[in-house]
């Protein structure tokens, strides 16, 4: 089956695994998914991730993070720019998520960045997702 939006599939898998409190999840790997996982790790939303090489596409394993009393660290994750409706933001219009409590993942000319990194580098781009 052909996947029309692999980023939305990744975010849905993370949301579903998080809701049932799985320790980890696996999904087909790609460079953009690896970069999204790296941003989520840098911002403290996931514990870690690893890329498992096989003879095909590879598998990205993401380890979800929970607080000491089993509360979810990711309370929401939403795809913003979709294949049917792209959403772009200029450097001075990069959105804040929950007034800085969450992040926006932005695809820029400097690669994938969080909203804070995009603002500090003064670059805009396509707003891929919100995570809070």
UniProtKB/Swiss-Prot annotation:
Superkingdom: Bacteria
Keyword rRNA-binding in annotation: yes
Gene Ontology MF annotations: rRNA binding; structural constituent of ribosome
PROSITE patterns documented for this protein: RIBOSOMAL_S8 (PS00053)
TM ranges: none
GO CC annotations on file: ribonucleoprotein complex; ribosome
InterPro entries for the chain: Ribosomal_uS8, Ribosomal_uS8_CS, Ribosomal_uS8_sf
Biological process, per Gene Ontology: translation
Keyword entries, A-Z: Ribonucleoprotein, Ribosomal protein, RNA-binding, rRNA-binding
Quaternary structure, from the entry: Part of the 30S ribosomal subunit. Contacts proteins S5 and S12.
Function text: One of the primary rRNA binding proteins, it binds directly to 16S rRNA central domain where it helps coordinate assembly of the platform of the 30S subunit.
Name listed for the protein in its UniProt record: Small ribosomal subunit protein uS8
Gene encoding the protein: rpsH
């Amino acid at each position: 089956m052909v996947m029309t939006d692999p980023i939305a599939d990744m975010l849905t898998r993370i949301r579903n695994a998080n809701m049932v409190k799985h320790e980890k999840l696996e999904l087909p790997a790609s460079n953009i998914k690896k970069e999204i996982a790296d941003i989520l790790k840098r911002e403290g939303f996931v514990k870690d991730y690893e890329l498992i090489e096989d003879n095909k596409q590879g598998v990205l394993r993401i380890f979800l993070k929970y607080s000491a009393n089993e509360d979810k660290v990711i309370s929401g994750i939403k795809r913003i720019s979709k294949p049917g409706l792209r959403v772009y933001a200029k450097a001075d219009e990069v959105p804040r998520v929950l007034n800085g409590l969450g992040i926006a993942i932005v695809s820029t000319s400097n690669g994938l960045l969080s909203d804070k990194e995009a603002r500090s580098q003064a670059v805009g781009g396509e707003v891929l997702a919100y995570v809070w």
